């Protein structure tokens, strides 16, 4: 369960999503055997939206890759739901978790914005 290639926490460098996706894919292509069936990304400190958007972009730009690319997010999947939970909003919690799960599913097949 890797993270995407991102600047370090202390870096002020701004990198476009397309460059993050390219560097991540290049690192995977160089180091992960094609026999590996799938790679499940951690969010690696990315916010919920960015984690999903970048996973989606990976799957859109590289549709013929050797492995399935998906998510294994904890914080990025639960963050919105936990905010609702902290306010005692059970219905909001359920809706937020369902929305985030659907978004990440769509990102894992490159269909987030379709």
Q: Where do the model's predicted regions map?
A:
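Active-site capping/gating regions of soluble enzymes
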Residues: 1-114
